[in-house]
Amino acid sequence: MIDDDGYRPNVGIVICNRQGEVLWARRYGQHSWQFPQGGINPGETPEQAMYRELFEEVGLNKKDVRILASTRNWLRYKLPKRLVRWDTKPVCIGQKQRWFLLQLMCNEADINMQRSSTPEFDGWRWVSYWYPVRQVVSFKRDVYRRVMKEFAPTVMPVQEAAPPRVPPAYRRKRG
């Protein structure tokens, strides 16, 4: 289902723990990481799609999470030209997304990325709240920044809700 502007309706999911960290998932067989996301099927509401994707990609059910917030508007990103499938009709040039902020209510051991017959992810970890904005693939970065800025007051105290001006350097453990 592609809209008239060439965007595929989609939901994005930010899952946070009680420490304000967020679930960061590694794409299956790749070195890229992102938040869970997926398309909205015909006849589905964004919330219904979110719960379906939550189960398919993370193995969690409605009872395992609590919705804390959702984005007020659709957020869009364009795909790089090399990723656009020009031979399909209609051509999808990007995604328009509604995002949900969820609080994990179950034990993290219940997270199971392998419930689907075609898993999207093969690993996950908890990361600091702003980490994904710096680490996601570049064409999604603006949407991630906007999502995290919108959700920040819900996750953390107001004085900490702005992204850091200069992101801390990433360091690998040596030795």
Curated annotation (Swiss-Prot):
The keyword Hydrolase applies. It holds the Pfam family NUDIX. Keywords: Hydrolase. It is an enzyme of class 3 (hydrolase). Residues 6-149 form the Nudix hydrolase domain. A motif (Nudix box) lies at residues 38-59. Gene3D superfamilies: Nucleoside Triphosphate Pyrophosphohydrolase. One of its GO terms (cellular component) is cytoplasm. Its cofactor is a divalent metal cation. Its EC number is 3.6.1.-. It comes from the Bacteria. InterPro entries: Nudix_hydrolase (IPR020476), NUDIX_hydrolase-like_dom_sf (IPR015797), NUDIX_hydrolase_CS (IPR020084), NUDIX_hydrolase_dom (IPR000086), RppH (IPR022927). GO terms for biological process: mRNA catabolic process. One of its GO terms (molecular function) is mRNA 5'-diphosphatase activity. Belongs to the Nudix hydrolase family. RppH subfamily. PANTHER family: M7GPPPN-MRNA HYDROLASE. Accelerates the degradation of transcripts by removing pyrophosphate from the 5'-end of triphosphorylated RNA, leading to a more labile monophosphorylated state that can stimulate subsequent ribonuclease cleavage. This is RNA pyrophosphohydrolase. It comes from Yersinia enterocolitica serotype O:8 / biotype 1B (strain NCTC 13174 / 8081). The gene is rppH.
